[in-house]
Swiss-Prot record:
This is Transmembrane protein 217B. Its main location: membrane. It is found in: Membrane. The lineage of its organism: Eukaryota, Metazoa, Chordata, Craniata, Vertebrata. Pfam families: DUF4534. It comes from the Eukaryota.
Length: 170
């Protein structure tokens, strides 16, 4: 298998994996009982934590949909041999995982003691998600580097051919 094929597999993996974790995030229960609205989180005095908890579904939706779109953009860039698109994908995955890690870190601090085992599940999901994404990044970067080197070689040949044509016409 060549680096291009690995990059395509990374794109497929990224879209499917992001979709899977997006579904997990949307189906996560934070309240139990309909009348009492018993929350698994304690009340926090931090505005950032409260805002993150309140807008978690919107943040997850925005990040996941952006990642899926950028994953599809990765397919296009691999097909058209655009190395800059592969680098954009790599930078986005790093940003995406750091934001998700920050959210898990913030929200695990306010989980009630009765639900602490749930925080371990959050950590396992987050760390496995990060490891899987970060394991794939070297293949993307290597393919981008190969495309960059290839474009430099083609540029030199084109300049050499253009200079030869101008010299013959003179």
């Amino acid at each position: 298998m060549n680096v291009r094929m690995f990059s395509l597999m990374v794109g497929i993996f990224s879209v499917l994996n992001t979709t899977q974790f997006f579904i997990f995030d949307l189906n996560q229960k934070t309240h139990i009982c309909y009348e009492a609205k018993f929350s698994i989180y304690v009340d926090s005095k931090s505005e950032l934590v409260t805002w993150t908890l309140f807008h978690r579904a919107n943040i997850s939706t925005g990040l996941s949909l952006t990642t899926i779109i950028i994953g599809c953009f990765l397919f296009y860039c691999i097909h058209k041999n655009i190395y800059m698109g592969l680098l954009i994908y790599a930078m986005w995955i790093i940003t995406y995982e750091l934001i998700n890690f920050s959210i898990v870190l913030l929200l695990n601090g306010i989980i009630k003691d009765h639900f602490k085992t749930l925080s371990y599940l959050h950590w396992i999901f987050q760390i496995s998600h990060m490891l899987l994404h970060f394991f794939c990044l070297p293949f993307i970067v290597k393919h981008a580097y190969n495309l960059y080197k290839e474009s430099q070689t083609v540029g030199r040949k084109r300049r050499h051919r253009l200079c030869s044509t101008i010299a013959v016409n003179s």
